[in-house]
């Protein structure tokens, strides 16, 4: 598709679609609780719809009237063997977390996904699950999907130090540990997003978190809850950057989730001199209104323990760095290589094709700014975040057209992205 270029300014306010991580987990916990859980403001992107369909296939009744989702929970002991293979679509969250849910189920399942998911390694989940007594096999020595799995009703608890900083792996092991005989200990490499831990407590469960150590006992039961999903900061990130780099812009984003494990991008924007303000802060819902406006930016260094707090925002942060004076270095981000695409290479290739100065490294990128951007053809390779990054980059283009291939990938997490963009262009 041909993208909008030569933006004169972005103005207006947006309510950001529901957080993808919390939407996935609300379906999972709602299914595993006893009673009817209601979820408001859920994200209806393709990944979340995949999770919803999988739990229906496992025997859970889920009603969606377009406003509220109602989940008739069955508990861990009420899940049924599916009649067919479980389709995870493009969703790494779905296949990894649901592997943990199914670890304690005494039936055969096969989980598969699209071409992109079929290239993503699952060994980081399958290795510890095997230690707990699960039979699971995938393709190649990295256990690529499809995965065949038979869980165990007598799962062994685990003491496990995560070799990578991954909220998905941590969450998969937490779901398995909830079904194990005894106490499990999971130790993170770096602190990652804690929505799973928060939701266990919201649904009446218990766990102990001290620093990077999580202790969790098996045999717990959950009680249905009312969940309101805040806006997704990973989706808001595209508008935060657009408001900072497009001339004559001021954007107000309402009801954005500001869980402390997800707000690395706000810290980076402040470090780079961006004009950003938080207001209407709700400490309980962990949400706020965020306002940004066009700013003079300077390069910065991004690495260490901030990386898990902004891993999904690094593509759009890279674009931000191309519009900052001086050098920006991103390091310790090798996890980008096993996302929907190798995001180090694909981001660098896309923005360099448009005139940026980006050198990919083994664990990140070196970006030299400020560079004007020009027209190019860019392929998302099925990665939603590459698509949205390119659409924001196109707004800065004064010379030539930007042709985005496979733009439909954006529907994975933000189906209303282009209509929201139109609103800001004419705000």
UniProtKB/Swiss-Prot annotation:
One of its GO terms (biological process) is amino acid biosynthetic process. GO terms for cellular component: cytoplasm. Pfam families: EPSP_synthase. Phosphoenolpyruvate binds at residues 20, 92, 120, 168, 343, 385. Its EC number is 2.5.1.19. The keyword Membrane does not apply. The active site is at residue 312. The keyword Chloroplast does not apply. Keywords: Amino-acid biosynthesis, Aromatic amino acid biosynthesis, Cytoplasm, Transferase. Pathway: Metabolic intermediate biosynthesis; chorismate biosynthesis; chorismate from D-erythrose 4-phosphate and phosphoenolpyruvate: step 6/7. 3-phosphoshikimate binds at residues 20-21, 25, 166, 168, 312, 339. It catalyses: 3-phosphoshikimate + phosphoenolpyruvate = 5-O-(1-carboxyvinyl)-3-phosphoshikimate + phosphate. InterPro entries: Enolpyruvate_Tfrase_dom, Enolpyruvate_Tfrase_sf, EPSP_synthase, EPSP_synthase_CS, RNA3'P_cycl/enolpyr_Trfase_a/b. Its main location: cytoplasm. It is found in: Cytoplasm. One of its GO terms (molecular function) is 3-phosphoshikimate 1-carboxyvinyltransferase activity. It is an enzyme of class 2 (transferase). CDD domains: EPSP_synthase. HAMAP family: EPSP_synth. Belongs to the EPSP synthase family. Catalyzes the transfer of the enolpyruvyl moiety of phosphoenolpyruvate (PEP) to the 5-hydroxyl of shikimate-3-phosphate (S3P) to produce enolpyruvyl shikimate-3-phosphate and inorganic phosphate. Monomer. This is 3-phosphoshikimate 1-carboxyvinyltransferase.
């Amino acid at each position: 598709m041909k993208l909008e270029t030569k933006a004169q300014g972005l103005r207006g306010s947006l309510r950001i679609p529901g957080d993808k991580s919390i939407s996935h987990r609300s379906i999972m916990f709602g299914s595993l609780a006893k009673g009817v859980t209601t979820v408001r403001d859920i994200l209806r992107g393709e990944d979340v719809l995949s999770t919803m369909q999988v739990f229906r296939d496992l025997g859970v009744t889920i009603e969606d009237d377009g406003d509220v989702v109602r989940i008739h929970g069955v508990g861990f002991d009420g899940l049924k063997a599916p009649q067919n293979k479980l389709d995870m679509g493009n969703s790494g969250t779905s296949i990894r977390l649901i592997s943990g849910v199914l670890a304690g189920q005494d039936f055969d399942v096969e989980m598969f996904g699209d071409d992109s998911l079929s290239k993503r390694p699952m060994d980081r989940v399958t290795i510890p699950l095997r230690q707990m007594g699960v039979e699971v096999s995938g393709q190649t020595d990295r256990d690529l999907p499809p995965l065949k799995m038979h869980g165990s009703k007598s799962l062994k608890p685990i003491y496990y130090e995560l070799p990578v900083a991954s909220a998905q792996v941590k969450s998969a092991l937490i779901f398995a540990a909830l079904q194990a005989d005894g106490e499990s200990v999971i130790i993170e490499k770096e602190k990652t997003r804690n929505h799973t831990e928060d939701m266990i407590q919201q649904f009446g469960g218990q766990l102990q978190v001290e620093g990077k150590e999580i202790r969790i006992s098996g045999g717990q039961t959950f009680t249905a809850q009312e969940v309101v999903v805040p806006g997704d900061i990973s989706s808001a990130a595209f508008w935060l950057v657009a408001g900072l780099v497009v001339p004559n812009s001021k954007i107000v984003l309402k009801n954005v989730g500001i869980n402390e494990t997800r707000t690395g991008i706000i810290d980076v924007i402040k470090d780079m001199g961006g004009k950003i303000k938080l207001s209407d802060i709700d400490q309980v819902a962990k949400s706020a209104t965020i306002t940004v406006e066009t700013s003079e930016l300077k390069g910065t260094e991004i690495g260490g323990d901030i990386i898990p707090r902004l891993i999904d925002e690094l593509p759009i942060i890279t674009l931000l760095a191309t519009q900052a004076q001086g050098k920006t270095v991103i390091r310790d981000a090798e996890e980008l290589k096993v996302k929907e695409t190798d995001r180090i290479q694909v981001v660098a290739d896309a923005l360099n094709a448009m005139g940026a100065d980006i050198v990919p490294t083994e664990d990140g990128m070196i970006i030299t700014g400020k560079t004007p951007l020009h027209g190019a053809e860019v392929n998302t390779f099925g990665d939603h975040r590459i698509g949205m990054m390119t659409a924001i980059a196109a707004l800065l283009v004064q010379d030539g057209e930007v042709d985005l291939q496979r733009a439909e990938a954006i529907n994975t997490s933000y189906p209303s992205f282009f209509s929201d963009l139109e609103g800001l262009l004419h705000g």
